[in-house]
Amino acid sequence: MPETIIESLDNEGRGVARHDGKAIFIEGALPQERVVFSSYRRKPNYELATAGRILAANALRVEPRCRHFGICGGCSMQHLGGPGQAAAKQRVLEDDLWHIGRMRPEVIFPAIHGPSWAYRTRARLSVRRVPKKGGVLVGFHEKRSSFIADMDSCEVLPLSVSALLPLLRSLIGALSISDRLPQIEVAVGDGVTVLVLRILQRLTPEDESLLRDFAEAQGVQFWLQPGGPETAQPFHPIEAPTLSYALPDFGLRLEFRPNEFTQVNHGINRMLLRRAMHLLQPETGERIVTEIHKREDVF
């Protein structure tokens, strides 16, 4: 297999190199690394590839924490530590500003960092019955594939949600409509977890009983979505706390529905708002008008 030296990262976290006059985009490779690569798609001007052996590693390379990394398509940069990821994304942003808008910022503030693990408060999990895998799979799609990753944990989801993955596989496998439930939307607020089940067929009374028992045992809320997003409604418990998250610096609490937009990382959102208000330095009596996407968020 050919080898090359990585020059940079693209906006999808792939290493970028030049080889035989072509741009090569290599998954799993980092800048300044010398890698052996294998191409899986060839075009006249570029190739898409995966890294094989790392002959000379970047000093910031780390061992991926998740044992599903490399197969699951939910993450692409676990082989680069958190500070390295932030620096790489900043460079991509600076390059985009220049190449698209011919802009070079006069001042760049330090990147805001948050936890690298168990931070993701939203997720769309795919569901599929796969007899060859022993039953129902619940998780993200595999890389470059319509197959669902065979996973029983996720390092970026909250620990309580990650622990639900094997339990959900068993639960859905016991439903009469297990092959008519293609998706679970996960939304996590402060102390509240909602699972929206996309169903293509009505539940039986036995199915409903199983869902109620699971919700009570695991402390989650089930919603059902028989059609488009607007059809999502609470199933059990009917009377339950609303999804929300607090902005304690400003005495605010934002409420949202599970299928409405919020930032995936609530902690980072709080820090962004704190920095924005510090930069604006509003005086007493001044009003600040913000553009709020779908009303629930501020960034």
Segments (PLM) and residue ranges:
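Accessory RNA-recognition modules of RNA-modification enzymes
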Residues: M1-F299
